[in-house]
From Swiss-Prot:
Keywords: Cell membrane, Membrane. This is Putative membrane protein insertion efficiency factor. Pfam families: YidD (PF01809). Residues 62-80 have a biased composition (Basic and acidic residues). Residues 61-80 are annotated as: Disordered. It is found in: Cell membrane. It comes from Streptococcus pneumoniae (strain CGSP14). One of its GO terms (cellular component) is plasma membrane. Belongs to the UPF0161 family.
Amino acid sequence: MKRILIALVRFYQRFISPVFPPSCRFELTCSNYMIQAIEKHGFKGVLMGLARILRCHPWSKTGKDPIPDHFSLKRNQEGE
């Protein structure tokens, strides 16, 4: 299951993302965050990635937002 989810994100990175200008507010891009979260937390990583995408908007804080060791939908405070 992990490989399928990661393949979907890689498809996005290769074919969809290049069409749009870079807009991620974080140092680890949202798509790379999603891949690493899936690798670390399985399907819960998808939820973490979606929560991260919802946090990525022009009015959010920028900077590092590393993947937490434990499942959480909140921004990792260690990254600030």
